[in-house]
Structures are given as C-alpha cells and as structure tokens.
Regions:
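Hydrophobic alpha-helical segments
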Residues: 1-173
Length: 173
C-alpha cells in the first residue's frame, strides 16, 4: 500500500488539469507517481517537465531511450519503473528478447552505439554518477554532446523515479 495515497481524480487541483489532461492523452491515464507528486503541484509540474524533456522530446528515438529506462529501472530494482517501462518499451517496438538480454547486461545483439549507451547508463547507476574514462570515451565515439546530455539526463530522471517509487511504496500502474 502506498505510503502517501495518490490523489484521487475527484481531488485534482485545477492548476494541474493541463498536466493531467496531457498524461491522459499521451499515456492513457495519470500514473500513480504523478498522482502522488500532485500533493505538491510545483514538484509534479517540474518532474513532468523534466521527464518529458528527457524521454519524450530530444533527438534520440523513444525506442532507444526505453531500453535505457528499462536498464536503469532493473538495476535499481524498481518494480514500479520496471513495469511502466517494460510496457512502454514493448509499445515502442522493443522485443521481449531484447528486454531479457538487456536485463542480463548482455548487449552482444545490439548495435555498438546502443551497447555503449547502456554501458554508460549502467556505470552511472552502479558508480553513483561516476563513469570511468574508457566508458565515456566509448560513448563519445557514437554520440555528440547534446545526445550525451540527453542520455545522462534520462538516467538521472529514471534514478529519481525509481527512488520515489520505492520511498512512496507505489504499486505498478
């Protein structure tokens, strides 16, 4: 049971209507994470804006970013984020077999570009933000600075989402 009850639809503040309407349109509903953060509207708005910028916007394809989101969620042991990003990865064309391989840290079937990004994400999570020069050099062979910022920002917001899901004991949506 969630430590903080997610805000019920009947109690949605008017100021969050645009955010919730957008979530309903793009995700089919308002996830428990956002209903929980809605107790503090400014934090929800900032979280959603950052999440949107890192996952939905940018130059890298969503399918690729869902692989990174999945890996971070699994490394963090977040059932909430794992369930959500498994669903979105499948929706964006990632195969079950790819998810299983990524979950094992087996990147041999992936393009070297994707493997470098996943190793970077893994290093960020396991090293608590510290990434060795070899991993960064491999990443920078495949990605420009804007893309590297996008990948690092995605890993960061996924770490936050995984932490919040655990702290609030959120059930998978």
């Amino acid at each position: 049971m969630a430590r903080i009850p997610p805000l019920a639809p009947a109690n949605e503040p008017a100021e969050l209507k645009p955010v919730f309407d957008q979530l309903r349109a793009t995700r089919g509903g308002v996830p428990g994470m956002y209903r929980t953060l809605a107790h503090q509207p400014a934090i929800l708005a900032a979280h959603r804006a950052y999440f949107h910028a890192a996952l939905d916007a940018g130059v890298l394809p969503r399918r690729f970013k869902e692989k990174i989101a999945w890996r971070v969620a699994r490394l963090r042991g977040s059932e909430y984020s794992s369930a959500s990003h498994r669903r979105y990865a499948l929706k964006h064309g990632v195969a079950e077999s790819e998810l299983a391989a990524i979950d094992r840290g087996d990147y041999t079937a992936l393009a070297s570009r994707e493997a470098a990004a996943l190793r970077f994400a893994e290093a960020m999570v396991q090293g608590r933000g510290t990434v060795n020069d070899d991993i960064y050099a491999a990443l920078s062979q495949h990605f420009n600075p804007a893309e590297i910022v996008e990948i690092a920002a995605l890993v960061g917001i996924m770490e936050l989402a995984s932490t919040l899901g655990a702290v609030f004991d959120l059930a998978a949506d």
